[in-house]
Amino acid sequence: LLVDAGCSLTDYYNGDITRTIPISGKFSQEQKVIYEIVLSAQKTAIKSALIGSNSSTVHNVALKVLIEGLKEIGLLSGSTEEIIEHQLYKHLYMHRTGHWLGLDVHDVGAYRMGEYEVPLRNGMILTVEPGIYISDRIPVPEGQPIIDEKWKGIGIRIEDDILINDTNPEVLSLSLIHI
């Protein structure tokens, strides 16, 4: 069960989290493997959310971890650079890794100013929410492995709210458990 929940606090600021919970009470072996890949991508991406970095850097860090994990279990093949360049991962991960968070759950604000990425600054808040979604309804790109039945129907996303500050990124939703 994938639960994407938001809330508005009394000061009008918002929170936005996603957790994936096994309906049976326990992840299958395949679900656990996918969960661990997504969790690793999220943790690595959060570490990259530093002052002066930008949302694309955070996204690309998560994307590389996802791709490496998917290659390791045989759901993607080829070099990571080629997979990214030709977007050969899009049938398994079709969105960006996060968005601004503030007075709106998907807060306003540009990610680019002309040809430059907006740098992360002290006090900014963004979400970090990588995911993997394995469907038999989305065509597998030519040259990529056919998806084994054991993986089909698995969808995992983990989202937390991250405050950019002077030292290290702070996970504001830290009190919410990860399964």
Predicted segments with their positions:
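Active-site neighborhoods and metal-handling regions in enzymes and metal-associated proteins
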Residues: L1-I177
